[in-house]
């Protein structure tokens, strides 16, 4: 049982490394390919991979017809619109700024839950958002307090954050 814990921790660390590197890889890919093309290829590869896993391990789940609209809506937001916004955001900014803004998703989520679901915000939620927001501002301005990032790229990345939260 102890070995299983190590496998889970290793898998988590490996996933974080891949996630962090994906910003750099995406930026490199966008130098040669349009973000839409890259996203299409990424989703095709993921579809083939996960479909193979479904059949290989017999993980087929029957989806009720009434749930198809909700699945389609969810797929439209995540991954489709999220990747579109993130892709064009990374094409217009640096991977550092992109990863910093995308890292705000877990901090914006409680705020959206407060607005739409009337959930309570904890002091840690508020503190986390403030610290993260200040960190993003520090990344976006230079020592002369001038805005250095592309506003277009920032807007696309903010769109990715909002779509991921929605």
Enumerate the language-model features and the residues they cover.
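Glycine-/small-residue-enriched transmembrane alpha-helix faces in small-molecule transporters
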Residues: 1-37, 147-166
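Transmembrane alpha-helices of multi-pass small-molecule transport proteins
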Residues: 8, 32-81, 108-109, 162-166
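Specific transmembrane alpha-helical segments of multi-pass solute transporters/efflux pumps
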Residues: 18, 22-23, 51-98, 102, ...
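Hydrophobic side-chain positions within alpha-helical transmembrane segments
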Residues: 25, 85, 108-112
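Hydrophobic/aromatic residues within transmembrane alpha-helices
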Residues: 29, 38, 42, 89, ...
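Structural signature of hydrophobic alpha-helical transmembrane segments
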Residues: 34-46, 87-105, 150-162
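C-terminal transmembrane-helix exit sites in multi-pass transporters
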Residues: 49-61, 105-130
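Hydrophobic transmembrane alpha-helices of multi-pass small-molecule transport proteins
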Residues: 50, 72, 121-142, 160-161
């Amino acid at each position: 049982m102890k070995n299983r814990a190590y496998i889970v921790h290793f898998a988590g660390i490996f996933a974080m490394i891949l996630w962090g590197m994906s910003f750099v890889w995406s930026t490199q890919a966008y130098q040669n390919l349009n973000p839409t093309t890259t996203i299409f290829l990424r989703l095709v590869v993921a579809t083939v991979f996960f479909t193979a896993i479904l059949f290989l391990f017999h993980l087929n789940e029957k989806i009720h017809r009434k749930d198809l609209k909700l699945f389609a809506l969810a797929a439209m937001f995540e991954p489709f619109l999220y990747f579109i916004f993130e892709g064009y955001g990374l094409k217009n900014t640096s991977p550092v700024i992109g990863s910093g803004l995308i890292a705000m998703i877990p901090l914006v989520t409680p705020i959206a839950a407060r607005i739409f679901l009337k959930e309570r915000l904890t002091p840690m939620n508020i503190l986390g958002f403030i610290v993260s927001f200040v960190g993003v501002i520090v990344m976006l301005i230079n020592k002369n307090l001038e805005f250095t990032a592309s506003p277009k790229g920032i807007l696309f990345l903010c769109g990715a954050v909002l779509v991921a939260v929605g």
